[in-house]
From Swiss-Prot:
Self-association and partners: Component of the nuclear pore complex (NPC). NPC constitutes the exclusive means of nucleocytoplasmic transport. NPCs allow the passive diffusion of ions and small molecules and the active, nuclear transport receptor-mediated bidirectional transport of macromolecules such as proteins, RNAs, ribonucleoparticles (RNPs), and ribosomal subunits across the nuclear envelope. Due to its 8-fold rotational symmetry, all subunits are present with 8 copies or multiples thereof. NUP116 interacts with the NUP82 subcomplex and GLE2.
InterPro entries per UniProt: Nucleoporin_FG_rpt, Nucleoporin_S59-like, Nup98_auto-Pept-S59_dom, Nup98_auto-Pept-S59_dom_sf
Descriptive protein name: Nucleoporin NUP116/NSP116
Superkingdom field: Eukaryota
Compositionally biased intervals (Basic and acidic residues): 916-939
Region Interaction with KAP95, not MEX67, annotated ranges: 536-732
UniProt keyword annotation of Secreted present: no
Region (Interaction with MEX67, not KAP95): 160-362
Main location: nucleus
Region of interest: Sufficient for interaction with MEX67 and KAP95: 362-535
Record's GO cellular component terms: nuclear envelope; nuclear membrane; nuclear pore; nuclear pore central transport channel; nuclear pore cytoplasmic filaments
Known function: Functions as a component of the nuclear pore complex (NPC). NPC components, collectively referred to as nucleoporins (NUPs), can play the role of both NPC structural components and of docking or interaction partners for transiently associated nuclear transport factors. Active directional transport is assured by both, a Phe-Gly (FG) repeat affinity gradient for these transport factors across the NPC and a transport cofactor concentration gradient across the nuclear envelope (GSP1 and GSP2 GTPases associated predominantly with GTP in the nucleus, with GDP in the cytoplasm).
Length: 1113
């Protein structure tokens, strides 16, 4: 490819691109005087000055690569345009006319003294101190300089254009397209104001070349490629072309420097030898682009290196007839010149290696890429400093290089004295295959890049005796394997392929073998006799033959990387192998039935093996030694001599009679039939059904064996232990029964020390207990209200008290307090001071009474009693006048005068007087003498003063309806005497029944009521209860009559003193036109289940009708 002398494809006559000239500036052979074509078909001149790479660069007589003439005529532009002969206007590369006329500003006139532009002073930053802040400001604008501050940027640019300073400063004040000085030279393209004069100044062209304008600014008298001058001017990149030895990229011809990248071409006139592509020395047979000879791509029929140091054969591997040298990475070169990376050569190497020194990385010219020395007398070090002598120097990682020391991975080295990169001997390559002069990856003598022979072509199309780049060899000489290990000759010693296939003739890339060779070697993934202890990288050793990636091994082999000992042979990756007894495959069992191998073997990953169990299946071998079951299957070995066997993960194992120890499967029992096996275990979930002497039960199943064994985890024990366990349980139960009489909770320690509370062993007591909120301060009624201290002396009642005498009632302390438990009210009348505290203490009985409604009345009555006692203390008005019931009735019938007094319960106590002296009792109203606090507390209980007409009307109505008072302040009509005279039938239908309270209101039943089952005295105060602005029927009685029964009939209810109260004065509002009164009436009309009848604003009387009295409040 790079340095062979054949054509592109197997052809013996043509060059790679149809040319026989130099490739990239290579020197033509002096023995070829005929005219040759260039690389692209351009005809070469026959003079002694040879053409460079493309026949144009620096050549005065060759054709231009793009059709332009390479002669010294004046019309040699690259694209065919003719150059002008005018000295002041020569043509550019694209035919543009160049001139020396400066840019003009159109019709604008130039002001005087304005052509200085920016040439007065070079640009510098202008600094100025800020007077306010004291900070120095640095201005990066040229218009801030004092020399140019009168001009703007555009003005300065215009002045520079007028002065011809458009492209920067030069010696003559003009510039070129790419800022090269243009004085009198021709610039690159001639269209941007450049001067295309044809003077012979010494300035360069487009890239700094001489002024002769060529293709890109070269002179008209030459045809250089990129502006190289024809005479005494530079070449393509500025090199001088006045001599006849220059190369394509500007190397000086008479010097000994390089050509394209520093190499020099030979000067046939003086016989000077120059360097190669990258500066390496070139002998008489110099290299081409990369050090090869000067044919098409460095191909030469002589024995020199190619592109990478290989023998100069054709572009592609056509057959060669000579033995070549080493390949690209240190392979040995048979001739004087080496390859690219450290190969031997007569002159300097690729990167400047000296003739007698090391290669690319400092190794000697005779050594290999990584320090492998093939010269027995060399004393220089390898790549990493190892000595390449015959002495026992270490390898890359310090291993010994003699025959007694191992390699990098512990393999024994052969009898060679020195090893390579990984400890292998120099007779083998980097991975252990033997060689005489190996390449980088262990190629055989004088191999190529990937192990091919040095005489081989690039892509395995060569017909020489050596291998190609991928190792296939079409000859019958001894050669080595290629990249993937296949071998293309019929030599007796060949390495294996990449995946273990043998390298015979007609081999395919992945191990299929076409011929039978007596001895072969493995390659990268195949076993090798010298690399790593006769094993391959992935465990296959091929002392005789190698396996394929999915094929069969036909010979005995040793174990490799993954532990399988390949003693006669190893199985394929997915299949078995027809050779002797070996290890199982990855997914299958080993189908070998060799009985001569007594060694132990192991099962495959998913299948069984001859002697050992596979990963998922039992073993099927007949080996006499130990074998194990697969991971999912049993061990199916039928050998009776097996000493140790194990079942599979999920299955049992039918081990023979000679097994001594066997374990059950994970989910199955152990079906061992061995008579000598004294110890067997059951499966995880199954019982042990063997007849062994000692067995354990499964996890969830009992042990059904006849011998002594343990039960399962969640099951009953076996029959052999039933009697002993039953006896033990009976004994324990008897002991528990003896103690159970004393402790009803058994003998468990959890309950033996437990204490039983009284709530468990004793009946439930009443839950009502005395509440103790705080032991230090008891919450009682006596603490809430301050008790009145007793007086030291009490006044006795006068015996001549007319009132008491008339009433003829003795003062009884028991009558001073009246407690009505059914009505939950306490009425405190006139009592002595010594009994007041006792009365309050008795009232605490109702403190936690669930039937009570409120203590508001109690508190208000007590306060009113205290105020009344203080007001009436010492007066006779404090006495109470009592009359008999008959006298009271007579007084009502006679309509005597009535006096009213305010009593302790807040109501009006009517005193029936027998005096007929006409004294007006209306003037004896008592004003309330209470403080402001008492007024607020009893605002709703304040007695409203009736007019004399109202009082007379109330009592006249009671007297006319045959009414009588019951309990306290309650009256009933008909009276009790009348109702007592009714028969039972009459009591079932009592018409016009009225029950009322003298202060709060009354109820009139509009339908007959049934009083047969109702105590008459309990109608007022118990069944029917009046409170301020409230009438309650069956307040605390759960059993109410049904509709139409008892007193649950239609009725009219009248409530007294239902005034709206003014919040500012706390007084009732009696004005009918007041807004609050109107609002109050509207609210009364909205009461549910009632029919509004009337409201009197003066008296505060509210009258409404209900359909069912017992269901309303």
């Amino acid at each position: 490819m790079f340095g062979v002398s054949r054509g592109a494809f197997p052809s013996a006559t043509t060059q790679p691109f149809g040319s026989t000239g130099s490739t990239f500036g290579g020197q033509q052979q002096q023995q070829q005087p005929v005219a040759n074509t260039s690389a692209f078909g351009l005809s070469q001149q026959t003079n002694t000055t040879q053409a460079p790479a493309f026949g144009n660069f620096g050549n005065q007589t060759s054709n231009s690569p793009f059709g332009m003439s390479g002669s010294t005529t004046a019309n040699g532009t690259p694209f065919g345009q003719s150059q002008l002969t005018n000295n002041n206007a020569s043509g550019s590369i694209f035919g543009g006319m160049g001139n020396n006329t400066a840019l003009s500003a159109g019709s604008a006139s130039v002001v005087p003294n304005s052509t200085a532009g920016t040439s007065i002073k070079p640009f510098t930053t202008f600094e100025e101190k800020d007077p306010t802040t004291g900070v120095i400001n640095v201005f990066q604008s040229i218009t801030c300089m004092p020399e140019y501050r009168n001009f703007s940027f555009e003005e300065l640019r215009f002045q520079d254009y007028q002065a011809g300073r458009k492209f920067g400063t030069s010696q003559n004040g003009t510039g070129t397209t790419f800022n090269n000085p243009q004085g009198t030279t021709n610039t690159g393209f001639g269209i941007m104001g450049n001067n295309n004069s044809t003077t012979s100044a010494t300035t360069g062209g487009l890239f700094g070349q001489k002024p002769a304008t060529g293709m890109f600014g070269t002179g008209t008298g030459s045809g250089g490629g990129f502006g190289s001058g024809a005479t005494n001017s530079t070449g393509l990149f500025g090199s001088s072309t006045n001599l006849s030895g220059n190369s394509a990229f500007g190397a000086n011809k008479p010097a000994t420097s390089g050509g394209l990248f520093g190499n020099t071409t030979n000067n046939p006139t003086n016989g000077t030898n120059n360097t190669g592509l990258f500066g390496q020395q070139n002998s008489n047979t110099n290299g081409g682009l990369f050090g090869q000879q000067q044919n098409s791509f460095g191909a030469n029929n002589v024995s020199n290196g190619g592109a990478f140091g290989q023998v100069n054969r054709g572009a592609f591997p056509q057959q060669q007839t000579q033995q070549g040298s080493g390949g690209i990475f240190g392979q040995s070169n048979a001739n004087a010149n080496g390859g690219a990376f450290g190969q031997q050569q007569g002159t300097g190497a690729l990167f400047g290696a000296k003739p007698a020194s090391g290669g690319l990385f400092g190794q000697s010219a005779g050594s290999k890429a990584f320090g492998m020395n093939t010269n027995p007398t060399g004393t220089t070090g390898g790549l990493f400093g190892q000595t390449n002598q015959q002495q026992s120097g270490g390898g890359l990682f310090g291993q010994q290089q003699n025959s007694n020391a191992g390699g990098l991975f512990g393999q024994n080295n052969q009898s060679q004295n020195q090893s390579g990169l990984f400890g292998q001997q120099n007779s083998s390559n980097a991975f252990g295959q033997p060689q005489q002069q190996g390449g980088l990856f262990g190629s055989k003598p004088a191999g190529g890049l990937f192990g091919q022979q040095q005489g081989a072509s690039t892509f395995a199309s060569g017909n020489a005796q050596n291998n190609s780049i991928f190792g296939q060899n079409n000859q019958q000489q001894q050669s080595t394997g290629g990249l993937f290990g296949q071998q293309n000759n019929q030599s007796q010693s060949q390495p294996g392929g990449l995946f273990g296939q043998t390298n015979q003739n007609n081999n395919q890339p992945f191990g299929q073998n076409g011929l039978q060779q007596p001895q072969q070697n493995n390659s990268l993934f195949g076993a090798k006799p010298t690399g790593f202890g006769n094993t391959s990288l992935f465990s296959n050793s091929t002392t005789n033959q190698s396996n394929g990636i999915s094929g069969n091994n036909l010979q005995q082999q040793s174990g490799g990387l993954f532990q399988n000992k390949q003693q006669p042979a190893s199985g394929g990756l997915f299949g078995s192998k027809p050779s002797n007894t070996v290890g199982g495959g990855l997914f299958g069992n080993n189908q070998v039935a060799n009985q001569n191998n007594p060694a132990s073997t192991s099962g495959g990953l998913f299948g069984s093996k001859p002697a050992t169990g596979s990963l998922f299946g039992g073993t099927n071998s007949t080996a006499p030694n130990a074998s194990s079951g697969g991971i999912f299957g049993s061990n199916n070995a039928s050998n009776t001599a097996a000493t140790t066997n194990s079942t599979g993960l999920f299955g049992n194992k039918p081990v023979g009679a000679g097994a001594s120890t066997s374990a059950g499967g994970l989910f199955g029992n152990n079906n061992n039939s061995s008579l000598n096996n004294s110890n067997g275990s059951t499966g995880l979930f199954g019982s042990n059904n063997t007849s062994q002497s000692t067995n354990a039960g499964g996890l969830f199943q009992n042990n059904t064996s006849t011998n002594t064994s343990g039960g399962g985890l969640f099951s009953q024990p076996s029959q052999s232990m039933a009697q002993s366990q039953n006896a033990l349980q009976q004994q324990q139960q008897q002991q528990r029964l003896q103690i159970q009489n004393n402790n009803p909770y058994g003998t468990n320690e959890l309950f033996s020390k437990a204490t039983v509370t009284n709530t468990v062993s004793y009946p439930i007591q009443p839950s009502a207990t005395k509440i103790k909120a705080d032991e230090r301060k008891k919450a009682s009624l006596t603490n809430a209200y301050k008790m009145i201290p007793k007086t030291l002396f009490t006044a006795k009642l006068k015996t001549n008290n007319s009132v008491m005498d008339k009433a003829q009632i003795k003062v009884d302390p028991k009558l001073s307090i009246s407690i009505d438990k059914k009505n939950n009210q306490i009425a405190i009348s006139n009592q002595q001071e010594e009994n007041l505290d006792e009365s309050i203490l008795k009232a605490s009985e109702l403190l936690f009474n669930p039937d009570k409604r409120s203590f508001k009345n109690l508190i208000n009555n007590r306060k009113m009693l205290i105020a009344s006692e203080e007001k009436n203390n010492g007066s006779q008005n404090n006495d109470m006048n009592f009359k008999s019931k008959s006298e009271e009735q007579e007084t009502i019938l006679g309509k005597p005068k009535m006096d009213e007094k305010e009593t302790a319960n807040g109501g009006e106590r009517m005193v029936l007087s027998s005096k007929n002296d006409g004294e007006d009792s209306a003037t004896k109203h008592h004003s309330r003498n209470m403080d402001e606090e008492n007024k607020e507390n009893v605002a709703d209980l304040q007695k409203q003063e009736y007019s004399e007409d109202d009082k007379k009307a109330v009592f006249a109505d009671v007297a006319e309806k045959d009414a009588s008072f019951i309990n306290e302040n309650y009256y009933i009509s008909p009276s009790l005497d009348t109702l007592s005279s009714y028969s039972l039938l009459q009591l079932r239908k009592v018409p016009h029944l009225v029950v009322g309270h003298k202060s709060y209101g009354k109820i009139e039943f509009l339908e007959p009521v049934d009083l047969a089952g109702i105590p008459l005295t309990s109608l007022g105060g118990v069944i029917i209860t009046f409170e301020p602005k409230t009438c309650i029927i069956y307040a605390n009685l759960p059993n109410r009559p049904k509709r139409g029964e008892g007193i649950n009939v239609r009725a009219r209810i009248t409530c007294f003193n239902c005034y709206p109260v003014d919040k500012s004065t706390r007084k009732p509002i009696k004005d009918p036109n007041h807004q609050l009164v109107k609002r109050h009436i509207e609210r009364l009309k909205k009461n549910p289940n009632s029919k509004f009848e009337s409201y009197d604003a003066d008296s505060g009387t509210y009258v409404f009708i209900v359909n069912h009295a017992a269901e309303q409040t």
